[in-house]
Amino acid sequence: MRTNALRLKTASIFSVDTKHVGVLDGVRALGVLCVLWFHFWQQTWLMPMYATPFLSWAGVQRINPDVLRRVGYLCVDLMLLLSAFVLYLPYARRRFCGTQVDPVSTFFKKRFARIVPSYLFAVIVMYAVAMAQGAYKGKAVFALKDLLTHLTFTQMLFNDTYLFTGITAVMWTVCIEVALYLVFPLLANAFGRRPLLTYGVMVLFGVWFTICVSPAFGEPRIMVNRFLTFLPVFANGMMAAHLYVWYAERVRHKAIPSILGTIAAAASLYMIFRLFRSCAAAGDASHQQVWQMQNRMFLSLAFTVFLLGASISMKPVRKILDNKVLSAIAAVSYNLYLWHQWLIVKLCSALGAKSGADIANGGVSMQWTVTITGLTVAFAVAALITYGIEKPVSRLILNTGREN
């Protein structure tokens, strides 16, 4: 009896959880915060540097996160990669563990409950404010088109509603998510049967469309975020989930795999920094968009290695990402993403600022005041909508109790 109990205890210590990967909450939270930082920086031009006297022995006197704030939007790719990973995880468990996946109807019902209530609330409120402030004055046809396309997740089909919406620019990401949901059951089943073939087709088709087709159909700002350009990102996310569950069924959290995972996470983090710096050095927005199209596959590979490495890394390393603070941020991350840019823009506008230069001219204290106020309001709004609208409505749609 004691021997069996010891074996069960040992198995629980070294087993890998394939139902909930804790570090993903931390990665999601940090990804959203990077995007938030970029949009806040656009409005305030706040560029702090941090003194590091404790690193003086290594010749590092200060840390300047300029690269991160200038190209933090690249973490949108990370969040889409995470979506593919999480969505495919049950299918990977079916392949390697023999578990069941939800029927297609249940899959769509859960996706609807997850994103639509908060999204529709945001669209309606932001549109109403835009109308009240005269954003559509003299543009009645566009006003109707902007609303209808956003309500139907089709705004990216039209250049005007994608680039010049009166609602908020970040909504395009939800369109990409919805497009992924619509085809995901087909992709997941194909990936489950022929993972290497499906992965190769998704990557090659996505790269071909991005490099060969996109330049002929529009300028970079129009084509950079089309659904097909993200196929390699989705493929890498699905492959990451596939490899993670494969690992979980064959290897346990012992010393050597954990050390190798930690090394892989550190190395990939360095590569991500190098890629971010390369994008920042590309030039203005249009040149950075060209860089994105040319390097999206490489960046998503670096993100993939980081996800896998961090997920199987040593426990102290995993705890950096898998903790209550980042989990709390991850819980409200969807609404934080939907609202943060709109809120900081409205805050700066209320102060009479027309650009980041106006806030910067008010001095560093003004920049910090606006930033901290914006963060406070953004998190408060995100929490209120998450727990006041998203979760209650989701429970009604799914007919589940509070504990679920």
What are these regions (language model features)?
Residues 1-211, 216-217, 327, 332-333, ...:
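Membrane-cytosol interface segments of multi-pass membrane proteins
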Residues 14-27, 65-72, 222-231, 253-260, ...:
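Membrane-interface helix-boundary signature
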Residues 137-148, 221-222, 227, 282-288:
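Extracytoplasmic catalytic-loop and juxtamembrane helix elements of membrane-embedded
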Residues 159, 208-221, 270-277, 312:
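Transmembrane-helix signature of polytopic, lipid-linked glycan biosynthesis machinery
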Residues 211-229, 236, 243, 247-251:
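Surface-exposed beta-loop-beta
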Residues 73, 234, 239, 261-391:
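Alpha-helical transmembrane segments of multi-pass integral membrane proteins
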Residues 73-75, 169-177, 225-238, 296-297:
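Membrane-interface micro-motifs in multi-pass membrane enzymes
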Residues 97, 136, 188-197, 244-256, ...:
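Membrane-interface helix-boundary motifs at transmembrane edges
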